[in-house]
From Swiss-Prot:
This is Suppressor of tumorigenicity 7 protein. One of its GO terms (cellular component) is membrane. The gene is ST7. Keywords: Glycoprotein, Membrane, Phosphoprotein, Transmembrane, Transmembrane helix. The modification Phosphoserine is found at S386. It comes from the Eukaryota. It is found in: Membrane. It is a multi-pass membrane protein.
């Protein structure tokens, strides 16, 4: 009984759904019936005669004006559609029709099981897309005072965008502050300094924090029962204040290194004290986490200073020690600094060892990892590689491995080859990058172009093979080959990260859809005809008549030729043959 009741309810439900689906036809016939019944009270016949009289009295100028107005409106719609496509990469009309009109017209599948399966199947790719569109801190970022500001002084251009600097301010607040900073006056001042937008205000706050720490406290130490001496003890220095001054006030790398060494002394003392107290409560644990971030940042920047000043082996040692001491702090991506320094030393065996550790499927990829792996593979065959010889005898196993590594790197970031091959000019890299985007390509090529030039034939091999990647992934936004589909958000994020004077590289190249080009041509042609007809009505009439006569005469000529050939064939009894043979005869 229960099953019978359930079946009856399902049938009733399906009947109701069917009736609502075709209810609009019923309404249509009802409206027609009402119009027929009310034709006399509504005076429909009189109204129709009035409308026909009005249409008969219209002059050709009205139709010309109507055509011109419609062309103007179509042109405005076209301009808006083109602007929307350039900004967002999709058609506004297509997006509205797919997103809003299609559900109303029943284009969405109502099967919940299919929707759930598809959503579960796409969840991994969606998460990967979100992670790839995340903005990362550039591990090879330059110094603001010693490098970025000097570029501004020379060229008058700002190499950093407000969005990029705002992200850096957020990073500084995350790494260098904690909830207990208000207990120490210097840290409280620095907590406000990291939020300042004005560089001079930040520098003044850092000096103020250091001046507060110059206050001396006297500690009474009894030596003899009858006498005491006074020992002068300095309060611990503020390491974050030295960091800010080294980053923004120092005008040379040498000055920045001196300030970072002072910051290292202060930061190392704070780190040791907080390490002993970290288990006494959550507050001390937060302080220790902050002091750890400060110490790692200082040591990494000191290693980068040594690398800039030519002491590359010292920089490599500092980076290796830092990675051994803090192996879990992967957010700074110190291994990318190490790879660049090892390539400068031409220690390719050590580079391969680092890649074997970090070029893992479970770790996030980067342009540095992918292109460095491609450089090592290309180094083995690039000096003897020749496109002509390869086309004759085919690629060897080593050459095939090198080409596959290049294709893998190009698929991950297709913008890099244009900078390595110097097809696009380089600019100073931003402080933040978007993986697989133009910003990451600039950051990589800025430091690694010299390493590719040093390997003989590497750029030649890259030039001959990098475009072959795009044949394997004809639709990169929908499906990738070795990586996930290329994220759509890279262009928008790169425009926020890179300065306005740089032309952002876009992949894949967006081409205007055919219907936009067709609409543009049709609107332009119609508007031109309307304008010419309005200005020169007699001349356009003669032109139109001449075009019609020419078209009709061409049709008649073809018909006459065909009829003549058919009569000749009938009289001579010639078998049917292609028309070209008749003309030859």
């Amino acid at each position: 009984m229960a099953e019978a009741g359930t079946g009856f309810l399902e049938q009733l439900k399906s009947c109701i759904v069917w009736s609502w689906t075709y209810l609009w036809t019923v309404w249509f016939f009802i409206v027609l019936f009402l119009v027929y019944i009310l034709r006399v009270p509504l005076k429909i016949n009189d109204n129709l005669s009035t409308v026909s009289m009005f249409l008969n009295t219209l002059t050709p100028k009205f139709y010309v004006a109507l055509t011109g107005t419609s062309s103007l409106i179509s042109g405005l719609i076209l301009i808006f559609e083109w602007w929307y496509f350039r900004k967002y990469g999709t058609s506004f009309i297509e997006q509205v029709s797919v997103s809003h009109l299609r559900p109303l017209l029943g284009g969405v599948d109502n099967n919940s099981s299919n929707n759930s399966n598809s959503s579960n199947g796409d969840s991994d790719s969606n998460r990967q897309s979100v992670s790839e569109c995340k903005v990362w801190r550039n591990p090879l970022n330059l110094f603001r005072g010693a490098e970025y500001n000097r570029y501004t002084w020379v060229t008058g251009r700002e190499p950093l965008t407000y969005y990029d600097m705002n992200l850096s301010a957020q990073d500084h607040q995350t790494f260098f502050t904690c909830d207990s900073d208000h207990l120490r006056p210097a840290d409280a001042i620095m907590q406000k300094a990291w939020r300042e937008r004005n560089p001079q205000a930040r520098i003044s706050a850092a000096h103020e924090a250091l001046e507060i720490n110059e206050i001396r406290s006297r500690v009474e130490v009894p030596l003899i029962a009858s006498s005491t001496i006074w020992e002068i003890k300095l309060l611990p220095k503020c390491a974050t204040a030295y960091i800010l001054l080294a980053e923004e006030e120092a005008t040379t790398i040498a000055e920045a290194e001196k300030l970072f060494k002072q910051a290292l002394k202060a930061g190392d003392g704070c780190y040791r004290r907080s390490q002993q107290l970290q288990h006494h409560g959550s507050q001390y644990e937060a302080q220790h986490r902050r002091d750890t971030n400060v110490l790692v940042y200082i040591k990494r920047r000191l290693a980068m200073c040594a690398r800039r000043l030519g002491r590359t082996r010292e920089a490599v040692k500092m980076m290796r020690d830092l990675m051994k001491e803090f192996p879990l702090l992967s957010m700074f991506n110190i291994h990318e600094n190490l790879l660049e320094a090892l390539l400068e030393l031409q220690a390719y065996a050590d580079v391969q060892a680092v890649l074997a550790k970090y070029d893992d499927i479970s770790l996030p990829k980067s342009a540095t990892i992918c292109y460095t792996a491609a450089l090592l593979k290309a180094r083995a065959v690039s000096d003897k590689f020749s496109p002509e010889a390869a086309s004759r005898r085919g690629l060897s196993t080593a050459e095939m491995n090198a080409v596959e590594a290049i294709h893998r790197a190009v698929e991950f970031n297709p913008h890099v080859p244009k900078y390595l091959l110097e097809m696009k000019s380089l600019i100073l890299p931003p402080e933040h990058i978007l993986k697989r985007g133009d910003s990451e390509a600039i950051a990589y090529a800025f430091f690694h172009l010299a390493h590719w030039k040093r390997v003989e034939g590497a750029l030649n091999l890259l030039h001959c093979t990098w475009e072959g990647t795009f044949r394997m992934i004809p639709y990169p936004l929908e499906k990738g080959h070795l990586f996930y589909p290329y994220p759509i958000c890279t262009e928008t994020a790169d425009r926020e990260l890179l300065p306005s004077f740089h032309e952002v590289s876009v992949y894949p190249k967006k081409e205007l859809p055919f219907f936009i080009l067709f609409t543009a041509g049709l609107c332009s042609f119609t508007a031109m005809l309307a304008l010419l007809t309005h200005q020169f009505p007699e001349l356009m009439g003669v032109f139109a008549k001449a075009m019609i006569d020419m078209f009709c005469s061409a049709e008649l000529r073809d018909w006459n030729c065909k009829s003549i050939f058919m009569r000749v064939e009938d009289e001579l009894e010639i078998p049917s043959a292609p028309q070209s043979q008749h003309f030859q005869t």
